[in-house]
Amino acid sequence: MAAAAASNGSGMEVDVAAFPTVMAQGVTGSVTVALHPLVILNISDHWIRMRSQEGRPVQVIGALIGKQEGRNIEVMNSFELLSQINEEKITINKEYYYTKEEQFKQVFKDMEFLGWYTTGGTPDPSDIHVHKQVCEIIESPLFLKLNPMTKHTDLPVSVYESVIDIVNGEATMLLAELSYTLATEEAERIGVDHVARMTATGSGENSTVAEHLIAQHSAIKMLHSRVRLILEYVRAAEAGEVPFNHEILREASALCHCLPVLSTDKFKMDFYDQCNDVGLMSYLGTITKTCNTMNQFVNKFNILYDRQGIGRRMRGLFF
C-alpha cells in the first residue's frame, strides 16, 4: 500500500489552533476497503472479554489481516496483540506479534498483515503513537477503530490511513478517514443472521436459547417445590404431627403411580438404543473431523510434491 502524502489537499500549511485533532483535513483516501463482519465480531468479543476480566471498559489492541490487490484491500480476519502502558503511552509487544504472524501464515497463507485495530472514540495522539509503532512493521498500515460505547444506530466502526501533512513547518503524521463497504462470505452470513435472529424479538439482553432455559428452570423449580411440599406432608402425617387426610394421600399415591417404571426391559432397551445413537453421532463427528484433517494433509503433501517436482525439472534443464 503506497503511502499517501498531502498538504491539506492544496499545499497549504495546517494551523494547529484551527485543527487541534490528529485528523487530516481535505484529504481523500488512496485505497478502497472491504470489511468482513468477522473482524467486527472478533473486536467486539475481545473488548467484552477484557471488560469482564477487568470489571471496567478497557482499550484493546489487535492486528488486521486480509488481502490486498493494488488499491483494493479486503480485511478478512484479526487477532489480538499484547501491549503494555509505560508513562501513559501504549507499547506493542512486537515479539508476540512476530510469533502470531508465523502462526497465522501457516493457517492463512494467502493473507497478510494489513494494520491494527483498537477501541474508543475519536482518534487522539495516543493512537498516532501506536500507529507509528505499527509503521515499523509494515508501510502505511490501516487503522480501524470501534466505539463500543456509542448509542447511535449506525455501525460504530471507522477506518483510517496515515498521511504526512505540514503542521507549523514540520512534517507530521495525521489520519485520513476511509470509506469502506461490508463484504461477507456464506459462513459469515449464516453466523450474523443467527446473531440477529437471537436478539430481533427481544431487548438484546437474552438470546432465544437463554429465554427457553429460563422458562424450563422456572417450571422445574415450581415442580420441585410442590414435590417437596407433598413429601413434607407425608412425613409429618407419618410422624403424627398432622392428621391424616386420606384424599390427599390417595392423590399423592396416584401421582406416584403415574411415574414411569424405570426398571422394565423395554426402558432398558430404549435407553441403550438412545445411548448407541448418541455414541454413533459422536463417532461420526470424529470421523468427519479426521477425514477433513487427512484431506488437508493430502493437499499440502501434493503441493509440496509438485513444488519439488518442478524444482527437479528446472534443474534438469541446466544439466
Swiss-Prot record:
Example of a GO MF term: metallopeptidase activity
Residues of the MPN domain: 33-166
Subcellular location: Cytoplasm; Nucleus
UniProt key word Cytoplasm: yes
A GO biological-process term: protein deneddylation
PROSITE patterns: MPN (PS50249)
Function according to Swiss-Prot or TrEMBL: Component of the COP9 signalosome complex (CSN), a complex involved in various cellular and developmental processes. The CSN complex is an essential regulator of the ubiquitin (Ubl) conjugation pathway by mediating the deneddylation of the cullin subunits of E3 ligase complexes, leading to modify the Ubl ligase activity.
PANTHER family listed in its UniProt record: COP9 SIGNALOSOME COMPLEX SUBUNIT 6 (PTHR10540:SF8), EUKARYOTIC TRANSLATION INITIATION FACTOR 3 SUBUNIT F-RELATED (PTHR10540)
Family affiliation: Belongs to the peptidase M67A family. CSN6 subfamily.
Protein name: COP9 signalosome complex subunit 6
Source organism (scientific name): Xenopus tropicalis
Gene: cops6
